[in-house]
């Protein structure tokens, strides 16, 4: 069955097996997308992918078919990732305020420490290190085009950015990656 048929089965008949087929088809590409956005944090990847599939299942009736199911799913994944990043920023802001109040003699009881976003030090894949130098938008666009194979118009739909902006992010990101990799022994001098 194609994606539209599976979506129809899920939407109309709440067919969980049809949704399982969609999950099986898109789980690896979605995890790969998150793996690159999180710079190799496998646990976070799994959590973000699970959250994406939960949101996709609960909102599947809002899928209109104007774009491919994969584009719609990756758009949800993109939003899930940035919701996560936004929550980290809030946690970082709370930690900053709480550390200031601690410095000034206040209490921080009940506040959790912020989640570390640094990559695993044992990670030896140079591409993740190279991806760290990119801005979030550049990393997202590079991941969607180079690794996932999405064309510029689909990347624009997923990210909500104009196609020209996507092209700019891709150009800058590829240039920075090439320079980084060249400096670190890849390619010709």
Model-derived regions: residue spans:
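Sigma70-family region 2
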Residues: 12, 40, 53-68, 87-89
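Structural recognition of an alpha-helix C-terminal capping motif at a helix-to-coil junction
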Residues: 47-54, 67-79
